């Protein structure tokens, strides 16, 4: 499904499979074309095989976002098995309700701008997002989780607050890991104004890369966040390198 300006779902059921589904493991050519820049996943498809996409308007060169491209889920049930991003938007994304089960060879949820999960004061069940397989699970420039339950399995970063065409990652493969938090790894140098904020809800991350990776700051104000990180040279929490910080004022981490 592709919308030029805005995609909104208020109810109903969607079951989507694109190209070879989440089992895709190589480059392909042809089709509708790509989109914005690469994200470090060298095994991703070169065609547009996203599950749901709100593109937005770009300049004539196709490189500078101008308006629109918002994706909003207020309710309903979404099941996606995609070779490219399962949910993707060029503008802002709001996952405020509904149930989403996503499997992908690339990003589970990707926003080129702000990504909001749940409502302020919302319950822990709304929305429900289960990313069973992904390269990176949740990606946006500014990520805020207010409520709901999010479960992520990723072969790179679980949550990634980065630019719209971020190029981090090593294309690792991995699943649920054993053991504790482990030490902080080296990884790629990063810095910026991107943010990742947890105000409520439940977050479960199983990542072979960094569990929670922000090129800017990470803030914990409430909710429950559980991270299992399995890949060498990475860490459960990773913020930017230029006067950025991880701050805790509430919740359980």
Where do the PLM segments sit?
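A composition-driven surface/loop motif
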Residues: 1-253
């Amino acid at each position: 499904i592709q919308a030029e300006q805005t995609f909104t779902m208020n109810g109903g059921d969607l079951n989507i499979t694109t190209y070879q589904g989440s089992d895709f493991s190589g480059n392909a050519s042809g089709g509708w074309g790509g989109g914005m820049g690469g994200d470090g996943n060298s095994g991703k498809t070169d065609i547009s095989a996203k599950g749901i996409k709100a593109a937005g308007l770009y300049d004539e060169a196709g490189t500078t976002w101008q308006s629109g491209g918002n994706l909003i889920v207020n309710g309903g049930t979404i099941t996606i098995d995609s070779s490219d991003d399962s949910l993707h938007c060029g503008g802002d994304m709001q996952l405020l309700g509904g149930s989403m089960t996503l499997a992908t060879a690339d990003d589970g949820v990707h926003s080129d701008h702000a990504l909001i999960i749940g409502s302020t004061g919302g319950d822990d069940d709304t929305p429900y997002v289960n990313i069973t397989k992904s390269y990176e699970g949740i990606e946006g420039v500014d990520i805020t989780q207010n409520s709901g339950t999010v479960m992520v399995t990723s072969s790179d970063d679980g949550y990634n607050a980065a630019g719209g065409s971020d190029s981090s990652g090593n294309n690792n493969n991995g699943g649920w890991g054993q053991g504790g938090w482990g030490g902080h790894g080296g990884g790629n140098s990063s810095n910026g104004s991107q943010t990742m904020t947890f105000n409520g809800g439940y977050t479960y991350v199983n990542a072979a890369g960094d569990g929670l990776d922000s090129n800017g700051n990470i803030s914990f104000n409430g909710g429950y966040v559980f991270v299992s990180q399995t890949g060498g040279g990475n860490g459960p929490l990773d913020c930017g390198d230029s006067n950025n910080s991880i701050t805790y004022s509430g919740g359980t981490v």
